[in-house]
């Protein structure tokens, strides 16, 4: 099947924002304008499009789509139709894993900022992730009609807090109640949108007299930014004092894709002003799949390879989100990086090393879902019926195996026991938790062997609250939750040169005999567990060595101090002995386990606790109180910045997670509700002796 839209006219973008910047309204307006311009029914001549809103109303649930496809021909109908996939990115820091996931499959992003609130802490987290994945972006300053709106303040904050290089492509006409429209600095015209048509119509007008000098200053700033794209343009600019519209747009596009600049626009999504021009900006300045480097991966032999965004290349795709639809089952959203995929194909999941059959392929639109027969390079769609694929897996052609990314998911730092309220909820709860764990790799479920309780673990208190809330909302399961528990770890600090483990039972008949000598030493943080076989002369036969490693690995799950998992140790097996008749795998497994436990006791065991990076935004009057409170929680205050544009302080600190429970309540009461905070996991560090003693005592058998 031939392409309907050439890949150069594809844009895979995310709309990303802090919680209150108005992302939802902005996205809704994007879907409204693009949907009106392009009636889906016409394109496919009565192809089966199933109305998705009706289903939602019948079921009373809302399915938020992880990726929505729409088309845009330009505010003035001046472009051929562009195929835009909008990937949803959550705004909360507990879901940074979700943001990372979506950043991975984006080619560009629109960062939405509130004209009043400006750049918030979460905006910084998202910005850092966009830097990490080198995502070109443009900025849209929303809510220009709100009291206190100030476009230029946001410009200053982007420079100060994000160290960004924003280039306004527009400046506002008025602000707050008097916000009328924008000045297009490329055309040097005012754009005024028509209220009656909900912003569908607009007209170009002359720039208001009192704004002309300002507009000229900002235009010069923009043209200079464009001229820096190449020596040739710089010379042209120096000779002629200006650049043509085509030159400016091409140069701004080039520098945006190289992540050197961030074009800035503004408007108010709620009042239907500005989003239309932002969509034009997406088409004009953000990259298509072929404007960015081909996707890197590893082949079967772990050698680096790339996959070009071409239909003729071998098929490769990344699963970036699993969503559960109670009626269709699991939807797996994938981004096709290269090649083509047809419904009915069998593909290879190179992470799980299993084959998967592609059932139906569906594309989500603003108010309907459409079944498509094939996906091409650059496409994003959802697949129904995958059995083993989870977030972060690669799907590829089994004759050209590639792994696009080894997803590294953070280990959960907090856990809670959950119990169903009634017997009837018991089975439903298990099902619900497994479904939710399949969707979100940073959320884990396990059963505590001693108490038989179900334990859920995640990235923060809010993360687990939302999981419990979703169980109730989507699966109808009422549950009670226990007190949050911190995920401590254990490690050792000294080397234990030689520790012996002997497991012998020889009392007649078939006996048991296993004997090992191990060296146990600490590794640098994050290095994990390493097992080295240094047996010389067959003192432990080859066939028993895996059993020795297994014995040590099984013991790692429960440390000697308080039963927490042991991390960052290196174990070397260098000597042992065996019995021709009585030795077996089980005996060596037991001997290794005993030796490792003994060795850990002698190697100065310690407990590690998760440390969180905490950022508090507070009015200046309360800064001292906040810092004192963080210090009393064993926090290390690492610095204090001004909130850009005045209005308070940002305090950055590193605080143990165990001291942060209930922090939001105490921060609220200490600052009369005027301070906000965000926190994310930073690293594990050794707990002080008094804390270790308290943990050990609390875990001791009563």
From Swiss-Prot:
GO terms for cellular component: cytoplasm. GO terms for biological process: ribosome disassembly. Residues 8-290 form the tr-type G domain. It comes from the Bacteria. GO terms for molecular function: GTP binding; GTPase activity; guanosine tetraphosphate binding; translation elongation factor activity. Keywords: Cytoplasm, Elongation factor, GTP-binding, Nucleotide-binding, Protein biosynthesis. It holds the Pfam family EFG_C. CDD domains: EF-G, EFG_III, EFG_mtEFG1_IV, EFG_mtEFG_C, EFG_mtEFG_II. GTP binds at residues 17-24, 88-92, 142-145. It is found in: Cytoplasm. Belongs to the TRAFAC class translation factor GTPase superfamily. Classic translation factor GTPase family. EF-G/EF-2 subfamily. Catalyzes the GTP-dependent ribosomal translocation step during translation elongation. During this step, the ribosome changes from the pre-translocational (PRE) to the post-translocational (POST) state as the newly formed A-site-bound peptidyl-tRNA and P-site-bound deacylated tRNA move to the P and E sites, respectively. Catalyzes the coordinated movement of the two tRNA molecules, the mRNA and conformational changes in the ribosome. This is Elongation factor G.
